Curated annotation (Swiss-Prot):
InterPro entries: CobQ/CobB/MinD/ParA_Nub-bd_dom, CobQ_N, CobQ_synth, P-loop_NTPase
Pathway the protein contributes to: Cofactor biosynthesis; adenosylcobalamin biosynthesis
Protein's name according to its UniProt entry: Probable cobyric acid synthase
Domain of life the protein comes from: Archaea
A Pfam entry, by short name: CbiA
Key word Transcription regulation present: no
Record carries keyword Secreted: no
Keywords of the record: Cobalamin biosynthesis, Glutamine amidotransferase
Similarity comment text for this entry: Belongs to the CobB/CobQ family. CobQ subfamily.
Family annotation (CDD domains): CobQ_N
Molecular functions (GO terms): catalytic activity
Length: 229
């Protein structure tokens, strides 16, 4: 039985992909068998898995960090944009259909079924599964059809770390707003906040850490410095 952990974000480009890679390498270095996972990824760039199927470059790179062979189970649904609001849908590494947004919505249950198959496989074959969310985990206009964030974390009974980019400003509002807008059953999955891309003296954040914990009952689990490289 695997332990599932999801890194979700308050926005795109908050640092989820790199953070998942880092956690994968840390656990792999401790001797655990670790799998990265992103249920649904939209990307034109793909790599070949050990099963001779396509997965997103991000999950391929994360598998290198985890020191495991890349598998289609790491990215069961890959969307490759084709223009005119249409994407080629890749399921478990193989082309499935070309679908526009509304057509894809009608395939949601099938995609969830395939995501569950991958979660079951990973649960049986790995010690840890480090999941990556997509974009913001709380786009309230899209929650009903979101199969990349907390719906999948709930399916996997995953603990969720919510990461936000302080370099953009408004980090505490982003964390608080995200938590408050989530449905209660998903909100309780969040076990800690991670503040990413911080520059300067961390002492200036002390009051903010205290207040966000008072408001949400969720601790700040990590502060990641900005990497100039």
């Amino acid at each position: 039985m695997a332990k599932f952990i999801m890194v979700a974000g308050t926005a795109s480009n908050s640092g989820k992909t790199v953070m998942v890679s880092g956690i994968c390498r840390m656990l792999a270095n401790k001797g655990y068998k670790v799998a990265p996972f992103k249920s649904e990824n939209m990307s034109l760039n793909s790599r070949v898995s050990v099963e001779d199927g396509e997965i997103a470059v991000a999950q391929y790179t994360q598998s290198v960090a985890a020191k495991v062979e890349p598998s289609t189970h790491f990215n069961p649904v890959l969307l490759k944009p084709k223009g005119n609001f249409t994407s080629q849908v890749i399921i478990h590494g193989k082309p499935y259909k070309n679908l526009d947004y509304n057509e894809y919505r009608n395939e949601k249950d099938y995609c969830i079924e395939k995501i569950k198959e991958s979660l079951d496989y990973l649960n049986k074959n790995y010690d840890y599964v480090i999941m990556e969310g997509a974009g913001s985990c709380c786009e309230i206009n899209l929650l009903e059809d979101d199969i990349a964030n907390l719906r999948v974390a709930e399916m996997a009974n995953a603990d969720v770390l919510l990461v936000s980019d302080i370099d953009r400003g408004g980090v505490f509002a982003s964390l608080y707003g995200t938590v408050e807008l989530l449905p209660e059953n998903w909100r309780k999955l969040i076990k800690g906040f991670i503040i990413n891309k911080f520059r300067g003296n961390a002492d200036v954040l002390t009051d903010g850490f205290k207040k966000i914990t008072e408001l949400t009952n969720i601790d700040v689990a990590g502060l990641i410095p900005y990497d100039e490289s």
